[in-house]
Structure formats: structure tokens, C-alpha cells
């Protein structure tokens, strides 16, 4: 019994000593981890810049299926944000500033603890050097938890290392794995839709499409509207010489919807037309490759473009359907005139056709 009392006393003294020691330790932390990723800098930057992609590489999210994310209208660029709840945490993340292809600064609140996150991107031999840094201050409870797990630098640093490795694998496979198939001539059905129009430079097309698609989906959710299919893009102008691209991000609807004047959302109707269909399976960054293959097929098969039709990209399978970019499906429809089909020959006419027998040449002796 006396031994048991001594054990309890030792345990009590240990807990008191640990508490005093932990409480005197600085709660400030500054953790940095880096990795070289074998992808172009703009590809890596754009992927990290969009909060919707974080579920594919953050180790603490991938290892906990209780995480539920909420994504607002803007999820990439300055002012972007997201929030989450899980069995043990609740928090939000916001992008404070962005320097295109160079750096991202963010503020995170997790279980009422605030931290600052910095991302830096630099070209290097073999790809892009990505540096992930986090600064913050721990409360007493978090300091105790960190103490028993090797310290905050070890806890956060290990998670960052695992996440950066996940990011490297994700970008290496998910971004670089794709296929393009020219399906051939099809009839593209028409229908009603709501759209938002934008002009921009070619280098900004992909980023702006992501932003506008997210806004359109948010508009439908906010107004409790149902779409009649997948979002699609109509290209009105594609002037490479002047670097001027005009397009509309569209969401199909079952019936015509009246939109009040002054709104940046408009309604429209797409007529059905004959088109050359090409399917891209993979990340949107390979869209230009799919376009080139479609145009080459069109030229090789002497297809005539129908300029009265609309060039359309349909996001048949997107990020809301599956997180893996390698499984996304984009359908491209280029309007063309139907190829003329030779008129079938009437077999009866052939059978009854009288062929004149050529005269036999004769000679007079």
C-alpha cells in the first residue's frame, strides 16, 4: 500500500513538474519545410492557390475521413477562403495576399488558434522549389500536446513533410496523366442556359474559368436553383494575334429564366448543331493539347467549320464529382458542316441499264 502511495506521489510530482516546465516554454513557433517538385512553377502555384485542391495532399485531411469542407464562391487568389469541421477540429483559412507564381500569404484559425502561412515558389534544377512556412502561438493545452509528441516543430514539420510528398506525387501523376480521343461527328443538343461573360488574355483563361464556374455554382446554390446538366464554356472570340479571348461560363437549365437587367448573369439558348467531338480525360491544363488534336483531325478529314455554331467545352466530370484531376472529363465540340454523303445508286436502274456494244472493227480484203 505504501509503495502504491509513493507511485501516486511520484506521478503527481511528475505532472506538476511537467506542467510547470511546459508553461514556462515559449508558445511561439516557426516551422518551415521545402521540397523540389518536378513540375513547372505556374502549375504548382495554381494548384496550391486553389483551396479545393488541398484535400488531395494535406496529410491530416487524407488520414481523417471526418473532415467536412465548405467552399464559398471564391476559393483561389486573394480573398479566397474555406472552412471545415471534423471530429477534433474546426477552423477556416483565408488567402491574404498573392504574388503570381511567386508567393502566397494566408491566415488560418484552427480551434481558435491563429497562425500565418507562407508559400514560396522558385525555379530550380529539376523543377520548382516549394517552401511551406507556418508561424503562430500555442495555448497551454496545445503546448502540452506538442510536448508529448516531440515538440511543435516535430509535430507540424512531420505533417508538412508528408503533405509536400503527397503534393509531389499528386502533381506528378494526377496532372501528367491524361488522354485525348477524337470521337468524331456528333449532333450537339441545344437548350437553355444561364451565363456570365468575360474578356481576358490567353494566360488568364484557365484561372478565370475556374473562378467563374465556382461563382456560377454558388449562384445556383444561393438561389436554390437546379441545373439541367454540367457547366460548359462557350467561346465567342479566340484571337491569338491580339491575345483577346472572349468566353461565357454557362450552366444549363430546363426552361428559359428571366434575369433582371443590370445583373452580370444573363440567359441564353443554344441551338443544336453538327459538331466534331473530342474528349479530354485529365487535368484542364491539357485542354490546348486536345484542341490541337481536334483541329488536326478536322484538317486531315477536310471538315468545314460552321462559323454560325458555338464552340463549346463541357465539364462532364469535374472537381465536384471526383477530386483526382486525372479522372476529370472535358468534352470539346467544334461546329462543322455535315459531310456530304454520295447519293446511293439504284440497283434496279443498274440492272436495267442497256450498254451499247461497241462496233466490231472489220476489214475488207
Language-model features, listed with the residues they occupy:
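An N-terminal domain-start capping segment
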Residues: 1-31, 86-91, 138-153, 217-225
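Hydrophobic ligand-binding cavity/cleft-lining segments
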Residues: 2-69, 215, 297, 332
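Glycine-rich portal/gate segments that line the openings of hydrophobic small-molecule binding cavities
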Residues: 3-9, 53-57, 65-112, 222-223, ...
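A solvent-exposed interaction/effector surface
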Residues: 19, 65, 109, 114-365
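Well-ordered beta-strand positions in beta-sheet-rich domains
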Residues: 32-34, 90-92, 105, 114-118, ...
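Well-ordered beta-strand positions
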Residues: 36, 96-97, 122
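Structural motif
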Residues: 41, 102-103, 127
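Hydrophobic pocket/interface hotspot
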Residues: 43-54, 82, 95, 130, ...
